[in-house]
Amino acid sequence: VTQGEDGMELSLFSRDVIALATAVGLSHNVFDAALFLGVCDKIVPGLFIGALQFGHLPAVFVPAGPMTSGLSNDDKAKVRQQYAQGLVSREVLLEAEQAAYHSAGTCTFYGTANSNQMLMEIMGLHLPGSSFVNPGTPLREALTVDAVKRAVALSQNKATGIGYQINAKVIVNGIVGLLATGGSTNHTLHIVAMA
């Protein structure tokens, strides 16, 4: 819906605002560990950059998992084309968008949001196997509870902050994972800032 609008030019700026807001939140110095909830496009890189400003804190990123399939990408594209041609109203366009993105979770295709989830798991910041479990399922709930338990356990050990965990090898592993899985090319911009 926002493709081609002026606000799209602010994508990297908004990532940096997310990083700053994360760092401001952590700056109150009252945390033993932190859970990071965010999956979409520039949110995860922003959270990651902000978390590293407080590298002494253990960090666990909690994925949402991909939403279940809604309106297919082909059907959604058809409605978008019809809207661009003036054949359907804005209301029809918005109904199609809502049917395609109808629930909690990441988009149903392997774009930036799902690449973020995979990247965080490869870098050791998600619980293993948690990236692609659908929201609203008993397993997703159990993984979220276990992520909290993991953050508490990490807070008991002084050398488990995200700054101790992230190094050049971890970044390279993330890049290899992105390349091996056909991950989002948006990370060619984000991974440099994250490193």
Which residues does each predicted region cover?
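Anionic-ligand anchoring segments at beta-strand to alpha-helix junctions in alpha/beta enzyme folds, i.e.
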Residues: 1-13, 186-189
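Alpha-helical support elements that line or immediately flank enzyme active sites
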Residues: 183-195
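Active-site cavity-forming subdomains of large catalytic enzyme subunits
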Residues: 11-166, 170-173, 177
